[in-house]
Amino acid sequence: MDHTSSVGLRKTGRRKCAVAQVRIIEGTGQLTINQRPGVPYLQYNPAYLLAAQGALDVTELTNRYDTIVKTKGGGLTGQAEAIKLGLARALCSLHIKHRKALKPQGYLTRNPLRKERKKYGLKKARKAPQFSKR
């Protein structure tokens, strides 16, 4: 498939507890997250913006597609990383040649790291109370 319909192409990305449903449609390069402009939503943070739009930069499609995202769960970092994965998957579905550009840079790798649970008898997940010999 080399083009998108008026409905667009939908893909899902996940990171930690965040889930992002990413839709790309032909347009001017605008990023919309939860019906709000993407830059203020991501608090003007360059790391979040790079994560959310990096896949478009790598494939040199920044000004050709609008990105519409519905995201929920987690924090801003998790949501930005979920958007990154969903957008990369959408671009790969758009054309197979984008996969060769995105895969070596890690855009198509799902990060499985999650918060480790707190264990009883410990203060945090791994932090133990101070040991006393006597």
From Swiss-Prot:
SUPFAM superfamilies listed in its UniProt record: Ribosomal protein S5 domain 2-like
Compartment annotation: Plastid, Chloroplast
Source superkingdom: Eukaryota
Region (Disordered): 105-134
A matching Pfam family: Ribosomal_S9
Gene Ontology molecular functions: RNA binding; structural constituent of ribosome
NCBIfam families: PRK00132.1
Family statement drawn from the similarity comment of this UniProt entry: Belongs to the universal ribosomal protein uS9 family.
Name of the protein this chain belongs to: Small ribosomal subunit protein uS9c
